Structures are given as structure tokens and as C-alpha cells.
Swiss-Prot record:
Residues 4-49 form the F-box domain. Gene3D superfamilies: 1.20.1280.50. The lineage of its organism: Eukaryota, Viridiplantae, Streptophyta, Embryophyta, Tracheophyta. SMART domains: FBOX. Residues 306-333 are annotated as: Disordered. This is F-box protein At1g31080. Residues 321-333 have a biased composition (Basic and acidic residues). Residues 306-320 have a biased composition (Polar residues). It holds the Pfam family F-box.
């Protein structure tokens, strides 16, 4: 019996629906199945569909810095409400970035094609450089500006290019635990009070309810894990999920490796033990990115041009070639594309074998 004649073919739209639920590296490999699949998976319809599906399942991206190399893992973020107060997840290894033959390679992102330049914007207020990392929420860049006897929240609207400064509560004194977070689309400032490691810990949070009226709402919580976590290491706030859960993590990578999700609305604390992280990276720095979403359009190496010390570009003495040094010409772009095609991040990512 001819099985091919009796078997019904799967519609292309159903194939795309199935593939949109797979990891990015898997969809990259499936481009090689056939010309038809390669065309469908590179189409803008599929990239938008994949982003929609990926946005519904955000992940926690973990980076570990070890001896000049950076290792990236990711694990699914637990969906609330939780059934248990403690769960165990496995981390997926994604990529290793580091030095090539003990020589640093720098990738320079060029925005636009002509008249690329920086513009200076005068800030009406002088301040010391902020120690806390700034955060951008809904087109407004927030940062803490520190004076001699006060702390201000600097608000820079990217669209109008205007500054606004808000006084920060004196109770929100500067310490190593102070953190700016995106709390449900609003600016949140968190600190841990009298913290000496481990649990329980006291967490304070200020939420900016109205920028124009300078209205803040203050919260205070005491975090106690319901399950027994035998760990006295320092944890700190790294961000908040889109659903409003505050994420706390350890400073260093070693077993057992925990991530904590605190829900202010339900006053619950979930501890997540992540396996596969911390076994070989004892006491190395860890970086976290909350609500990480895979996007097939993020193909940075195909639109990025790099310069290395091996073959520096030949300098021209012509005064009319200044812009040629800043922006690659179209002829050079094609050559650069061929050069970096072999080290494309997405292509390298999809060649990794599934565990």
C-alpha cells in the first residue's frame, strides 16, 4: 500500500502554529528542512507569530561571568498562582561569549545610514554619577541623582527630551540594596532594611503613582520562605515580572542555586531551585534579566559591523571621507555581511544540540 498516497498532508498554517511554540534554535534548524520551510520560517508572518507565542511564556535569563567568558542560561518563570511554595526547574544552556584567540573583538552597532552623530542635551541640575542602574519605562528614563543631603529621581522623557526631578523619600536612603524596578508599568524603588543575609528579610518599596503630582505609595513587607531554605547568602532584588512579582536572587553562582519570586498582592514567597547552574561556576558573578522573550528578528550580527586590531581599516587623507569612517558604505556592507555570516549569533544558537 502506498502510504504517501493515503496520508493527508498537514496544512502550512498548522505547521507554522506548531513551530511557533518551539525554541528559537529549533526553528532555526528547521529552516534547513526544505526551501519551502526556509521561506515560511523567514517570513515576517512567522516572526510575528513566534514573538506572540514567546511573549506569552517569558523566561529568566541568567548570565555568569567566568574568567573573561560569559555563559547564558534561561529557565521558565513560574506562572502564578502557585500550587506549591517551592519548585525545581532545569536551566537550558544557550551560548558562551568570550575572547577569540585571546584577542577582544568589538562589535559596533550603527544606527541609520547617514549623518550619524551624538547630540548633547543640557541637564539643568548637577549631580554625582548615580550608582544605581537607570531604567526606562514607557519612554521615560529614570535614574537617581545624588546630592550632598538629598536624593532625587531624574526623569528624562525621550520623546520630548525634557528633564523633571522628583524628591525621593528620606527613608529611601542609599545603600547597596537600593534598586529601580518596573513595577506594573510604574517606577518602583526597593531597599532591604537592616539586611545581613538569609531570611527573613524586610523589604521596602516606593511606587511612583503620579509623576506630575509627585505621588508615591509606600509598602513594607517581611519575607519568610514557607519551605526550609538552608541558605544564609545575600540575596538582592533584580527586577519584577510583568505580573508584579518581585524577583530576588543570589549574588554568586553555587549549589544550591535559588531564585525567589515575591508577590506583594498575595504576600507569598516562592523559592525556585534551578538545576544546572552553579555546579561549575563557584562564586562567580551572576547577572539576571527578567521577562526575557525570544525574538527571531534579533539577528544582530547581520546588521552589525565590527573592527578588530588584526586588519584595521585604511585611513584616508581626504577631508571628504570623514563620514566614510563613521558609516560603512554599501559596498563594504556586503563584504562585512559575508565576513560575519559564519559568526551570526542566531545561526550559532540554532546549531547547538538539544539536550
Amino acid at each position: 500500500m502506498n502510504r504517501g498516497a493515503n496520508s493527508a498532508s498537514i496544512p502550512n498554517d498548522l505547521i507554522l502554529e506548531i513551530l511557533s511554540r518551539l525554541p528559537a534554535k529549533s526553528t532555526g534548524r528547521f529552516r534547513c528542512v526544505s526551501k519551502l520551510w526556509g521561506s515560511m520560517l523567514c517570513h515576517s508572518y512567522f516572526t510575528e507569530l513566534f514573538l506572540t507565542r514567546s511573549s506569552a511564556r517569558p523566561r529568566l535569563l541568567i548570565g555568569i561571568h567566568q574568567d573573561g567568558d560569559r555563559f547564558f542560561f534561561s529557565c521558565p518563570q513560574p506562572q502564578s498562582p502557585y500550587d506549591n511554595s517551592s519548585i525545581v526547574l532545569a536551566a537550558d544552556f544557550h551560548m558562551k561569549f568570550g575572547r577569540v584567540e585571546d584577542e577582544w573583538v568589538y562589535h559596533i552597532l550603527t544606527l541609520g545610514t547617514e549623518n550619524v552623530r551624538w547630540r548633547e542635551i543640557i541637564c539643568p541640575f548637577s549631580y554625582d554619577p548615580p550608582r544605581e542602574k537607570p531604567i526606562c519605562i514607557n519612554g521615560v528614563l529614570y535614574y537617581i541623582s545624588v546630592g550632598s543631603y538629598y536624593s532625587l529621581i531624574g526623569c528624562f522623557d525621550v520623546r520630548s527630551e525634557k528633564f523633571k526631578f522628583l524628591y525621593l523619600s528620606p527613608d529611601c536612603f542609599p545603600n547597596w540594596s537600593r534598586k529601580l524596578i518596573n513595577y506594573k508599568g510604574k517606577l518602583g524603588v526597593t531597599i532591604m532594611e537592616d539586611y545581613h543575609g538569609g531570611f527573613p528579610l524586610k523589604l521596602r518599596m516606593w511606587v511612583l503613582e503620579d509623576v506630575e503630582k509627585e505621588e508615591w505609595t509606600r509598602y513594607a513587607y517581611t519575607l519568610r520562605p514557607e519551605n526550609k531554605v538552608e541558605d544564609n547568602d545575600y540575596v538582592y532584588v533584580v527586577g519584577a515580572t510583568a505580573s508584579g512579582e518581585i524577583v530576588l536572587t543570589k549574588q554568586n553562582a553555587y549549589k544550591p542555586f535559588y531564585v525567589f519570586y515575591f508577590s506583594p498582592e498575595r504576600n507569598t514567597l516562592l523559592s525556585v531551585e534551578i538545576q544546572g547552574v552553579g555546579e561549575e561556576w563557584f562564586y562567580h558573578n551572576v547577572y539576571y534579566f527578567v521577562d526575557h522573550v525570544e525574538d527571531l528578528r534579533f539577528d544582530v550580527m547581520k546588521t552589525t559591523y565590527a573592527g578588530t586590531s588584526r586588519s584595521p581599516p585604511k585611513q584616508s587623507t581626504s577631508t571628504s571621507s570623514r563620514e566614510d569612517h563613521e558609516v560603512r558604505t554599501l559596498a563594504h556592507q556586503k563584504e562585512d555581511r559575508l565576513t560575519f555570516e559564519s559568526v551570526n549569533q542566531f545561526d550559532a544558537l540554532r546549531l547547538l544540540e538539544d539536550d
